Amino acid sequence: MSSNIFGSVPILVVVAIQLLLVHNVSSQNVTNDYLNHQCNNTQGRYTHGSTFEKNLNQVLHNISNLDLRYGYAYVSNVVAYKVSKDPNIVFVLLQCRGDSFGSKCHSCLSTAVSGLRERCPGNRGATIWYDQCLLEISSVDSEGRIHYKRMFYMQNPTNVTNDPKRFEDKRRDLLHKLMLEATKDSKENGAKGLLYAVGEMRIGRNKMYAMVQCTQDLWQTGCHVCLEWITQMKYGEFFYRKPGGRVCGRSCSFRYELYPFLRR
């Protein structure tokens, strides 16, 4: 899949058609495939041995030393980055899928760092997606913002033929239920949770499996807005009659399949 400049289209629409066949459930279907990347040419480039590169390497090293027990990190080389004027400031966001925390998140981080260096060498801003994590490097602070332009969708090329309207109603109901689950307060202390939810629903002889997730720099309200945007407003029509599909974004994502694709 080719790289894309962030500002080239109103909403990045990358249709990566995948043949998502139903696999043996015992295989768990847990993969960490490369999905897409975006090289942000508007932020400029850095050279080998530059201060920016040294700062970037240090931030990535600092993240690799975290336990990543909650699968998330947003780290800069400057403590007071909200008011810093440093031209070589670096921001790195890592968000791992909700079933890929801890050591699994570390593994995906390593893969993503290598992938980003290969696909966007020298870019001061870039994002890469894998099945189990999202990694973004940037020279601009983007914490807490909903990024509507940095997203793409993937869908199963086949169509549901048996009662497609009922299938669509069930799909929407499940994703809506998971959106509410992901954005509710934590039961322990009323704070925000992990902004992640998984579920399943019986549809005739089949069972649908789904997940929704937001990056943890958002709060519940922002997460709800982002998930509503990708599940209903912007991309909902693209999945009519599709037995599997996903939207991957910088701020939120969802996926549904007719086979389990997450760790138990």
UniProtKB/Swiss-Prot annotation:
Residues 1-27 form the signal peptide. The keyword Transcription regulation does not apply. It comes from the Eukaryota. It is found in: Secreted. One of its GO terms (cellular component) is extracellular region. The keyword Signal applies. CDD domains: Gnk2-like. Residues 34-142, 148-261 form the Gnk2-homologous domain. Keywords: Repeat, Secreted, Signal. Belongs to the cysteine-rich repeat secretory protein family. PANTHER family: CYSTEINE-RICH REPEAT SECRETORY PROTEIN 26-RELATED (PTHR32411:SF70), CYSTEINE-RICH REPEAT SECRETORY PROTEIN 38-RELATED (PTHR32411). This is Cysteine-rich repeat secretory protein 26. It comes from Arabidopsis thaliana (Mouse-ear cress).
